């Protein structure tokens, strides 16, 4: 007979495999809710007065220099396919000096033999790497020791605590006790020597919530707003009964659009390191997010789709994103990301 721990680890590993399959094969994108960036437009400069070849996309984040303001957002781990994906993404991050986060490492604590699917530091020795676990696990017997093991597993520069109440509501046997979680996040922030990143999973962090998280000691906010992959839809596809499937459909478009998250968080925290993610699909989206106040931008689905195809597809995606961001800067007359952010080039449409 399997022990409860063995059963839990098998369920977690199966869930990870399901997530990859569903994201790649099913329509799990937001429909009625967009990322909100379409409400903004850059003012075109017909005389940029700069050489496109001199444009500098570099950014410094958490003390590390990135060649472009890009984060390969948290996606996967814990299965053989996930291990291959993470290796490919890590090599890309190393080659292009992007930041990278992995998917939840809970599965590797429950099943240590899959920890190697997260062991990517050897492929990305110079990359800004983020470890990852669900914040709610702090209410389910996880604490400092487990978080340190997760960080050490990746040799990570920071720890993502992903916050996903809606997903847990729809996920079969989800962990839904969020009571007192902010205090536990605060305690963990005090005890860890690496920065803690608070990240939603596609439903957004408001300015009011960011204020509480920052007061608790969180050092980075990743807004992960609505408009991209709907985890309500994903979990609805996995649902074991009609009620959960109904919940997935009902809340498929629930969340705060990414653009609103960026502006509201930046308004209450002018200097907090801020990551924009949630439905960003190209370099124009990334440039808009930076102009709205983000420091770097995270993409997950585009990198996942390319990684499953080939390393060549990943390289092509990276080159396209860089070219798109560069073109925005050139056609708005800005030579650096700092200039773009403070240029007033981005206008909200009426």
From Swiss-Prot:
Substrate binds at residues 15-16, 104-106, 167. Involved in the biosynthesis of isoprenoids. Catalyzes the 1,3-allylic rearrangement of the homoallylic substrate isopentenyl (IPP) to its allylic isomer, dimethylallyl diphosphate (DMAPP). This is Isopentenyl-diphosphate delta-isomerase. The keyword Nucleotide-binding does not apply. Homooctamer. Dimer of tetramers. It catalyses: isopentenyl diphosphate = dimethylallyl diphosphate. The gene is fni. NCBIfam families: IPP_isom_2.
């Amino acid at each position: 007979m399997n022990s409860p721990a063995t059963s839990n680890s098998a369920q977690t590993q199966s869930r990870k495999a399901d997530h990859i399959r569903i994201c790649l094969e099913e329509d799990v994108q937001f429909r009625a809710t967009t990322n909100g960036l379409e409400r903004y437009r850059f003012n075109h400069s017909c005389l940029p007065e700069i050489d496109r070849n001199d444009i500098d996309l570099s950014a410094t984040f958490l003390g590390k220099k990135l060649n472009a303001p890009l984060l390969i957002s948290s996606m996967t781990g814990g299965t053989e396919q996930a291990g291959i994906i993470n290796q490919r993404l890590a090599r890309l991050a190393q080659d292009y000096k992007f930041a990278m986060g992995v998917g939840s490492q809970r599965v590797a604590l429950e099943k240590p033999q899959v920890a190697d699917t997260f062991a990517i530091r050897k492929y990305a020795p110079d990359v800004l790497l983020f470890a990852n676990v669900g914040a709610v696990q702090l209410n389910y017997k996880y604490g400092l020791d487990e978080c340190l093991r997760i960080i050490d597993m990746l040799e990570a520069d920071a720890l993502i605590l992903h916050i996903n109440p809606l997903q847990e509501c729809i996920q079969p046997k989800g962990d839904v006790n969020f009571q007192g979680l902010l205090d536990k996040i605060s305690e963990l922030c005090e005890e860890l020597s690496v920065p803690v990143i608070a990240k939603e999973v596609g439903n957004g962090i408001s300015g009011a919530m960011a204020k509480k998280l920052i007061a608790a000691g969180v050092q980075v906010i990743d807004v992960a707003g609505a408009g991209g992959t709907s985890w309500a839809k994903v979990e609805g596809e996995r649902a074991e009964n009609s009620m959960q499937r109904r919940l997935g459909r009902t809340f498929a478009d629930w969340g705060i659009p990414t653009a609103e998250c960026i502006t509201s968080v930046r308004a209450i925290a002018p200097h907090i390191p801020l990551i924009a993610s949630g439905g960003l699909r190209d370099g124009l989206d990334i440039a808009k997010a930076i102009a709205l106040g983000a420091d770097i931008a995270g993409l997950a689905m585009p990198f996942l789709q390319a990684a499953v195809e080939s390393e060549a597809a990943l390289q092509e995606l990276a080159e396209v994103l860089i070219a798109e961001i560069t073109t925005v800067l050139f056609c708005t007359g800005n030579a650096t990301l700092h200039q773009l952010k403070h240029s007033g080039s981005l206008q909200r449409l009426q």
